[in-house]
Amino acid sequence: MSSLSLAVRDSSTMLRRNLLHARRYPSLTLNLLLTPVMLLLLFVYIFGDAMSAGIGGDRSDYIAYLVPGLLLMTIGSTTIGTAVSVSTDMSEGIIARFRTMAIHRPSVLIGHVIGSVLQSVLSVVLVGLVAVAIGFRSTDATALEWAAAFGLLVLFALALTWIAVGMGLVSPNAEAASNNAMPLILLPLLSSAFVPVDGMPGWFQPIAEYQPFTPAIETLRGLLLGTGIGHNGWLAVAWCLALTALGYFWSAAKFNRDPK
């Protein structure tokens, strides 16, 4: 059997293992998923009338404005579970057992990554369905724009997942992993997810504009709602590629060096 065949076989085995864990212990996934859903309902039904003034529209306009940011926040929330899962594997010694077996070493991490991306996609679909149920519509987007939006969400999920894997590997326990990964769900709060960047204090606008989430959010808005994308599309892709590379090499270096 070739090296590629072994890698695919072992990665598939690790993927099944992680999906079985997620199905057997759904509480963590549900808790992480409920956060974006609750924020969506909170900002629409409690703060919607007040927040919509910031974009010059009504509540229905604010739903459309809010959803792209909440979809990305859903991905960030889901990947926190990945950091916890990786840290748990490291601290409980299962990784040490895998090291003694004749398996493709990177398959352990690849299984976590693919499983997390699949969970992120399912979570995004669920949050999207909730958004549609409360009034979100994207009637002008073409099939190509929908495909591009989906591709960006998958690429963003891949990038954040590799970062979360690295955070899990450097954390001594699951609690620390959860805390270390919190920026993945807090960064959207400092982006254009809830209010436009030009409505923020002048000194803070560059921080909000050029962090990873804002370009991706504005690109999703452009694809789904027809707003201007400008340079945000290239920035979003560049951030995704950079974070994926950073997370991959960080995780690989830590995984290969860690004696646990």
Regions found by a protein language model. Give the residues of each.
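Alpha-helical transmembrane segments and their short interhelical loops
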Residues: 105-181, 228-252
